[in-house]
A protein has these predicted regions:
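Intrinsically disordered, low-complexity segments enriched in serine/proline and basic residues
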Residues: 1-10
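A glycine-rich helix N-cap at a beta->alpha junction
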Residues: 126-141
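Active-site metal-binding motif and surrounding structural segment of the metallo-beta-lactamase
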Residues: 63-110
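Conserved beta-strand hairpin/beta-sheet module of binuclear metal-dependent hydrolase folds
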Residues: 19-72, 77, 104, 200-202, ...
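Short, conserved secondary-structure transition motifs
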Residues: 113, 139-149
């Protein structure tokens, strides 16, 4: 099944929005597992699990009861297209399950996101949460730079503005980088919805494929240590990089030292990374 050369596009229509979910051709063992938060008549939203981790990304924050608390709490980074009600009403549900969890929730979105987050938080009384270690950051992306504000449960979610930062990858027009991780980047571009509405593209840097047959022939088990090896590749470690890994065999475990270049040569194939785009209301 040759998925690598194919694209598929699923266009979903509701009574209020034209919803486009584009998933680029992915490897047979994709790094991202994505699905819609609601059906075609519900609020727009896309939940993306980063496989083999406890991490997820959430695109838009509409009604999200279908996700449940466990999935919501995995989504430390949330990318908001705009703050119309059907894209932002789920803020309160996430806030409620995150209180007292010691988490940092990062929200990324268009101009106006910071005062809208502030307004949501000011809708409640916070005199009993001074011992709750919850931090919310909001990043607004403007043509001339990034504005950031932080809200802490320990002081009743007062607004703390941070210094502005330059926009990465853009001079005011076209795509710009919203979030960067060794494994992937999230880029955005502003569309016209009578307000700026951000469209997002999640791009894996590249995909690391392990040949399990060769690993087996070499007496090496699959397991968490391979995830660590992937991270070294995404971080750009050189071929002579040495590392130790704990290997779990059927009846024992051992710690061995490896050289990254030898792992690459014997067991690894690098292919194009997975890409997912999220576009609504334009």
């Amino acid at each position: 099944l040759k998925l690598r050369s194919r694209n598929f596009k699923q266009q979903l229509h509701s009574r209020r929005t034209h919803y486009s979910w584009l998933c680029d051709a992915a490897p047979m063992n994709p790094s991202f597992s994505s699905y819609l938060v609601n059906d075609v008549f519900g609020d727009p939203g896309l939940f993306v699990e980063v496989r083999w981790s406890k991490r997820a990304l959430l695109f838009d924050l509409g009604h999200n009861d279908a996700l449940g608390p466990t999935r919501l709490l995995r989504a430390s980074d949330i990318f908001i297209s705009h703050t119309h009600m059907d894209h932002f009403i789920g803020f309160d549900a996430l806030l409620r399950v995150a209180l007292g969890r010691g988490k940092t929730l990062r929200r990324h979105g268009p101009p106006g996101l910071i005062p809208n987050v502030q307004g949501k938080l000011h809708g409640y009384t916070w005199n009993l949460v001074d011992g709750y270690p919850l931090t919310i950051t909001a990043h607004e992306f403007h043509p001339d730079g990034i504005q950031t504000a932080t809200f802490l449960a320990t002081d009743g979610f007062q607004r703390h503005d941070e210094p502005d930062a330059p926009l990465n990858g853009c001079t005011g027009q076209g795509p710009f980088t919203v979030f960067r991780d060794p494994m992937f980047t999230v880029q955005a571009t502003a569309l016209n919805h009578r307000i700026p509405s951000l469209a997002y593209a999640l791009q894996e840097q590249f995909h690391v494929n392990f040949n399990k047959e060769r690993l087996h022939e070499a007496g090496l088990p699959v397991g968490y240590w391979l995830k660590e090896v992937k991270q070294y590749f995404w971080e750009g470690q050189p071929d002579d990089f040495r590392f130790c890994a704990t290997l779990y065999h059927e009846h024992h475990k051992e710690t061995r030292e490896f050289i990254l270049g030898e792992i690459r040569e014997r067991f690894v194939t690098i292919t194009r990374g997975q890409k997912i785009a999220y576009v609504v209301d334009a």
